[in-house]
Amino acid sequence: MSKKLLKSTIVVSSMTFFSRITGMIRDMALAQVVGSSEVADAFFVAFRIPNFLRRIFGEGAFSAAFVPVYSKIEVAGDEGKRKAFLALMAGRFGMILLAITLIGVVAAPFLVMVIAPGFLGESEKYELTVSALRLTFPYLFFVSLVAMAAGIFNSRNHFAVPAVTPVLLNLSLIAAVLWLVPIMANPAIALATGVFVAGAVQLIFQLPFLARERSLVWPRLRVGKSDKKPIEGEVNKVFRLMLPALFGVSVAQINMLINTLLASFLVTGSVSWLYYSDRLMEFPLGVFGIALATVILPTLSKQQADTSSSLFSDTLDWALRWVLLIVLPASVALMVLAGPLLTTIFQYGAFTPTDVTMASQSLVAFALGLIAFVVIKVLAPGFYARQDTRTPVRYAAIAMGVNAVLSLLLVWEFAHVGLALATSVAALVNAALLFFGLYRRGIYQPLPGWWSLLLKVAVASLVMGLVLWSGAGDTHSWIESSLLHRLGWLSWLIVVGLGVYMVSLLSLGVKPWKMMLVEKIGEEGD
């Protein structure tokens, strides 16, 4: 199991890395075309609303509820029941999504008024956002069904297809920048059209792979009388688990919506600065955090179904050690290289040096909470695998309250940076609550060696950070440099930083290869 877990994590991380690279190219194209203008703010709000719902309704809450229930059916081995469950699930989930999509398109003016009330004072920006939202909202319908397909693949430990599917969104938006923006009257509408097309393409892409898995079923709203009770019971259980999970998995996204709402009252560009800095913070979060969470949820669900309580705890411990080993130095690197990263990736065309300065400040604030964002992704499945979606909800409610209070306190003094900082603090609170919740219940028992590992990784990260800081220079030097010089300089810093970090770890006695398998955790310092 442990070798399969490691292999699956590497596969998902590799595919996600490719997806994030294409995402960076996409954002470079967006920065060059719209920068942090009114058009950019309008598109980012129009895209954030369905994307927010997709993350909590499609990928987050649905996966948290669907995977444990479906994994149990898979383990039972009844093929007829499995297909009947999928057919009923697809039919009812699809109807709910269709209804929400229609409501969203009709209620677009109200949604923009709620999410970005600051736009009401600028009628052109408000109307443009509404028009763009009516094109982007159907993306929710398509991509939530894609999330169901991903749940099927992940439950069978087939992670490659769902991990690479997001690339299609990036390619669609790049195509929109290249071919639609030049011929359409408004860039925001052109980009919104690209989002709509991306949703349909992503769903179509999944179909042949579902057929190969013998999981491509015709959606149904009812099942035969003989299957009715057990199948409907399982489908209803998914929706029951999903209701509290809707809130529990969405706290980070709700916090970002609060940021968008408050940022809409700030100077033009604030929404965009938060978007660009969030995108950079999401790179390590997606490549490692979400990839790891994707892999361990079905693993934990099967271990729970097999009542493997010891292995359940060991799997969580294995994941947390890798979070510390990879994410802590990534967080330090993001803080030290915020300016160079933003300059190299985005500072072209409409994206100005001022935008670099403002976005780098919020990136540092987001990076402070990066390890907490990843820990949440890893620990929440510890509850979801046990079909407990209510406990994470309570913790998420507390964290969201912390974010709301801090956002209101900090936004007037620190503007968009205060909003990013509030989000990071809320994530730290949420991660701490999840950790102690699992620990108090005896679900997770840390294995020996944690304090030693924490100290050694912190020292190695600090040494790496000092080397990067001394080699990075000031942001002005990066702004004045050519693209090739920026790329070469940044690549050199990344290679040197990785080398210094690895040498520091080895000098301190940390041997990462001893953490590769679940059975080997706790031996890395031997």
Residues covered by each model-derived region:
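Membrane-embedded alpha-helical bundles of multi-pass transporters/translocases
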Residues: 1-526
